[in-house]
Amino acid sequence: RRINNDCQNFIGNRAMYEKVDWICKDCANIFRKDGLLNNCRSNCFYNTEFLWCIDATENTRNKEQLEQWAAILGAGWN
C-alpha cells in the first residue's frame, strides 16, 4: 500500500484518505493512462486530474465532500 507523502494529515485520517484515493485508483483502472494515478494523487489530490477523475468516475454528486476531504488531508495547501 502506497502512502502519499504529499498529504500532511494522512495519519489519523486513513479512512478519509482511502475514499479519496479510490477515486484516483478507479480512474486509472478505467482509462489505463500512464501516469494518471500519480498525477491524480499529486499535491495531495489538489490538482486538475483529481477533479477530472471525480467527473470521469461519475462521482459528481460527492464532489464537494471529496474536495473537502482532500483539503483536510493536505491542510496547508488550500
Curated annotation (Swiss-Prot):
Produced by the medulla terminalis X-organ in the eyestalks and transported to the sinus gland where it is stored and released. One of its GO terms (molecular function) is neuropeptide hormone activity. Coiled coil: none annotated. InterPro entries: Crust_neurhormone_CS, Crust_neurohorm, Crust_neurohorm_sf, Hyperglycemic, Hyperglycemic2. PROSITE patterns: CHH_MIH_GIH. It is found in: Secreted. GO terms for cellular component: extracellular region. Disulfide bonds join 7-44, 24-40, 27-53. Keywords: Disulfide bond, Hormone, Neuropeptide, Secreted. It comes from the Eukaryota. PANTHER family: ION TRANSPORT PEPTIDE, ISOFORM C (PTHR35981:SF2). Represses the synthesis of methyl farnesoate, the precursor of insect juvenile hormone III in the mandibular organ. This is Mandibular organ-inhibiting hormone 1. It comes from Cancer pagurus (Rock crab).
